[in-house]
Design a protein with these regions (language model features):
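Short acidic, glycine-rich surface-loop motifs adjacent to enzyme active sites
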Residues: 17-29
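Short, well-ordered beta-strand core segments
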Residues: 21, 48, 66-68
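Acidic catalytic cores of enzymes that act on phosphate-bearing nucleotides/polynucleotides
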Residues: 1-14
Length: 324
């Protein structure tokens, strides 16, 4: 039985169908769409647990219980990146204070609840269980153990036997994961855009994303003064033609509005976006308890029916010059 997706969980908290939530390693009050709705959902929750390495994220303010987690250098384990590469990460230092690794927190909780199957002696034992689940699949790492990872370096899966060097490139044997083992190319018969269409009230399409020096919701990178010198606050990138028509110039302050909320930010006029499209970075949350820089005030909760990914790249907005 599949559980709820991220956006569905907060809908359930808001309606009262779900009473409690345990948030691990994420800051949904900044990262999820329609932030003010997320905030109301957290306020409505009966019990909120936040497990993170930062106690200063926007979400931790709503935590009834804050579980301090260990950072990457403070715990042992493996990491798999987007090129299928598995790397062993050794523990360098002990975590500060009461902080524990995510694994330790979860296993301690499970044992307190008398759940079975959590009597792991080490992270290696957990990895071994995970690896065995991949046996005889297209992502087989059942033969890749800690010893090889520690002594031979990283591997790209699949690693289907003990002496296998890993698979830097897939399908070099020209055998694909189809019944015929031949590649199948499916051309779309139609292009379906279910996003809300711009109109006279909200004529611009807002797309959101990242900038060079910040990572996600800035709980780590936002503390590094040098990283804040490049772009110290969120800036709306606007096409020169749109800016000319609206009599807006670089460094002007504008109000950006959608059906979900508003933000107030500076403008940068640039050819980085096409006409009628504007860009705003998603990293900033509340500043001095004010949410006028929080981009996800604007975004909508429309999600893809298959992936459940929110429609972060397409929100209809209006833009007007700010007047004191």
């Amino acid at each position: 039985q599949p559980g709820l997706t991220a956006t569905e969980m907060f809908d359930a908290l808001a309606s009262g169908a779900m009473k409690a939530i345990w948030i691990v390693c994420t800051n949904p009050l900044v990262s999820l769409p329609e932030s003010r709705k997320i905030e109301k959902a957290l306020q409505n929750a009966k019990f909120v647990v936040v497990q993170d390495i930062s106690h200063r994220s926007d979400t931790t303010k709503y935590a009834d219980l804050l579980l301090p987690a260990a950072g990457w250098l403070e715990k042992e384990g493996t990491m798999t990146n987007s090129e299928r590469r598995i790397t062993y990460l050794s523990k360098g230092i002990n975590p500060p204070g009461e902080a524990l690794s995510d694994i330790e927190i979860i296993t301690r909780f499970a044992k307190k609840m008398n759940f079975s199957g959590f009597d792991y002696a080490s992270t290696e034992e957990i990895y071994r269980e995970h690896a065995l689940l991949t046996k005889n699949t297209t992502i087989d790492i059942s033969f890749l153990n800690y010893n090889r990872l520690q002594n031979e370096g990283s591997f790209q899966w699949p690693v289907p036997d003990y002496g296998h060097p890993g698979t830097p490139r897939l399908f070099t044997d020209k055998k694909f994961y189809t019944p015929s083992q031949k590649a199948i190319f499916n051309l779309p018969t139609a292009i379906e855009n279910t996003s809300e269409a711009p109109d006279s009230n909200y004529p611009f399409i807002l797309t959101t994303g990242r900038i060079r020096d910040q990572w996600h919701t800035m709980t780590k990178t936002g503390k590094v003064s040098r990283l804040m010198t490049h772009i110290p606050s969120p800036v709306l990138e606007m096409n020169p033609i749109d800016a000319y028509k609206a009599e807006i110039e670089t460094d002007d302050i504008v109000i950006v509005s959608s059906k979900n909320g508003t933000v107030r930010v500076k403008v940068k006029v640039a050819n980085t976006t096409r006409e009628s499209v504007v860009f705003l970075p998603m990293h900033w949350g509340k500043q001095l308890d004010n949410d006028l820089n929080r981009t996800n005030n604007l975004t909508n909760t429309l999600i893809d029916p298959l992936s459940k990914e929110p429609d972060f790249k397409y929100t209809c907005v209006a833009i007007e010059k700010y007047k004191k």
